[in-house]
A protein has these predicted regions:
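Short beta-strand-turn/beta-hairpin segments enriched in glycine/proline and small hydrophobics
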Residues: 144, 152-168, 183-204, 224-225
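Short histidine-centered loop motifs in beta-beta connectors
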Residues: 163-177, 205-213
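A structural signal for short beta-strand/turn segments enriched in small hydrophobics and glycine
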Residues: 175-187, 213-222
Length: 283
């Protein structure tokens, strides 16, 4: 996969800049800032930070450490934050997706680090869709369009498959809102406890593909999730910088009235279309 190193031209415009460069690339991570009822507000000592970055640390402690380092970066404490950078790179292969997701978000905070750029090219191919999407957003900060397919995916419906074979029992109805980790359905496999199907992404239930009570096979499509407003908003800001003319039709579909998209998101879609057209024409 080739990395695009040249940053695309960004025409000036205060309204567009305000929409694009607000609190950049934050929304997608929000569901993981509070993990299992744990508030990551306690300031960690250097000793604790080092301990929590070890491979033997509890995943939520590692996430706590990553969030504190990201706060140091945001405050401009470069010397303090960079001392931990060598300990971050091994976390690219951490077994827990919440940790990899937070790591991708953190690496987007310091776009001067070549090591972070390289790590993000790995994370953008992660098995977890939320990790891939955060990595794609972070890559935009490096002027790298490698994550563009993921950004486009954030604008499109996501199909949920059954992780097990058995009798499907839906928990939600169509149009219900969904957060990351929301219980979507249960699959009765013959074991004492049914297998829980939880959402990997935020959004809302767009369509049920199988009748409730039907026997499904492992890997069978069961549900379609439409993207959340926050994910669409973030993707549009990323595509503002790296989008191409072939993306215009997908983006155009977001400019009309919708019960699930805020006016600012539809406006961002129009701005993104405008700047992609200008970029393609060399203006």
């Amino acid at each position: 996969m080739t990395t695009e190193k040249t940053k695309p031209h960004i025409p000036p415009g205060p309204k567009v800049k305000l929409l694009v460069f607000g609190v950049a690339f934050l929304m997608v991570l929000v569901p993981f800032l509070f993990w299992k009822g744990t508030w990551f507000g306690t300031v960690l000592s250097d000793q604790k930070l080092a301990e929590y970055l070890e491979s033997s640390a509890r995943p939520r402690d590692t996430q706590h450490a990553l969030l504190q380092i990201s706060e140091q970066i945001a405050r401009g404490e470069r010397e303090q934050s960079r001392r931990w950078y060598p300990s971050l790179l091994p976390l690219v292969t951490h077994p827990v997706p919440e940790v990899r997701n937070t790591l991708a978000w953190l690496m987007g905070q310091d776009a001067k680090q070549a090591e972070f750029h390289q790590a993000l090219t790995v994370l953008v191919k992660d098995s977890n869709p939320l990790v891939r999407r955060n990595a794609a957003l972070a890559l935009v900060r490096f002027g790298d369009a490698q994550g563009r397919p993921e950004l486009l995916g954030m604008l499109r419906p996501f199909t949920v498959v059954s992780p097990r074979a058995g009798v499907l029992r839906y928990r939600l109805k169509e149009d219900d809102s969904v957060d990351t980790g929301t219980l979507l359905a249960r699959v009765e496999t013959g074991e004492p406890e049914p297998f829980e199907v939880r959402s990997l992404l935020p959004g809302f239930v767009s369509e049920k593909l199988i009748e409730d009570g039907t026997t499904v096979t492992e890997g069978q499509n069961i549900l379609v999730l439409a993207p959340s407003d926050a994910q669409v908003w973030e993707a549009l800001r990323g595509l503002y910088l790296v989008g191409q003319t072939e993306d215009l039709e997908t983006i155009q579909n977001l400019t009309g009235r919708s019960t699930h998209l805020a006016e600012r998101t539809r406006q961002q879609a129009r701005f993104t279309i405008e700047v992609i057209k200008k970029r393609s024409s060399g203006v």
